[in-house]
Amino acid sequence: GASSEAVTYSIRQILKHVKLPVVETFQGAGIVSRDLEEDTFFGRVGLFRNQPGDMLLKKSDLVIAIGYDPIEYEARNWNAEISARIIVIDVEPAEVDTYFQPERELIGNVEASLNLLLPAIQGYKLPEGSVEYLKGLKNNVVEDVKFDRQPDEGTVHPLDLIEVLQEQTDDDMTVTVDVGSHYIWMARYFKSYEPRHLLFSNGMQTLGVALPWAI
């Protein structure tokens, strides 16, 4: 998957040369590093199609799916209109269905494929119209966590709790998340800047998994 250290490094090398917008899945949390966040990160997507990242996927001229696993977020959710142009970069052929039909597939060593692509796209600049759209969308990402929080007396808003947790962690710490409604809040709003340092159980969504992971 895209979250391996080698693949993450190659993705970051591309993003340092070409400011392409990136959307992470929950399992892909941490691929975008802290220094690349401002220019390239547009949030995470999964479960429900209502995030800024979903807006980006719908508007994209081309979706490059790197190590994408449909069990995380099925294409019928993010490509309901069946309008997305898709290229897959993975170690095995894509699971093609009505909603996921790649135009091209680069199958093999993902790190090597990305390294070979870098010289071909180096120097590419997004069209001016796309840049303006992304500026507006980035504001949506930022404002999404700034709305007025007024929890009932004696309760805590989930985002307030996440902010406290964020203050207690650094980029080297690994955070394990159990299954429940808090899982959605953490997946969308908890920031992680290293791959496989924010862990979720997708697919079967194993209850209680956070404890043995932590052990």
Give residue spans per PLM region:
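Short, basic, glycine/proline-bearing loop/turn elements
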Residues: 1, 32-45, 59-63, 143-151, ...
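Active-site diphosphate/adenylate-binding microenvironment
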Residues: 8-11, 138-214
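Short, solvent-exposed amphipathic alpha-helical segments in soluble enzyme
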Residues: 8-19, 78-83, 104-105, 189-194
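Short glycine-rich anion-binding loops that position phosphate/pyrophosphate groups of nucleotides
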Residues: 1-3, 28, 68-71, 180-182
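Short hydrophobic/aromatic-enriched beta-strand-loop microsegments
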Residues: 20-22, 43, 88, 108, ...
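Glycine-rich, acidic loop regions that bind phosphate or pyrophosphate groups
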Residues: 28-135
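Catalytic alpha/large subunits of respiratory electron-transfer oxidoreductases
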Residues: 1-25, 62, 171-174
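Electropositive phosphate-/nucleotide-binding environments in soluble metabolic enzymes
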Residues: 5-8, 47-50, 104-111, 115, ...
